């Protein structure tokens, strides 16, 4: 059994990075994160965390911003009411939308266009105006 997340350490506002990913990288991830950072988000590379740390990270989170990745399976460890913002390429399935619905989480998504069509391994860039609009709607209401 994993102990509950307690004490200082992980931010309640989590930005999951794909900087170390071998494929489906977000070429302007630094620019995207720069828009979330002033809101108190901290960036995490899940591959740098032990399993128990990933569990604690998601247990503690109130908001999770993530590009589509297997790391979002950690949503099963979330606390009720967690807000999930998933960014994924238009050809990808948004399975984590279904998981979020099943877990009764707040869910929003942004679709991006891959740099190459018909490839599940291509990199992408995220239009910053979409991020700014989402932040305005969700965090500055």
Task: Describe the residue ranges of each PLM region.
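Short acidic active-site motifs
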Residues: 53
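Active-site donor-binding acidic/aromatic loop of nucleotide-activated sugar
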Residues: 43-47
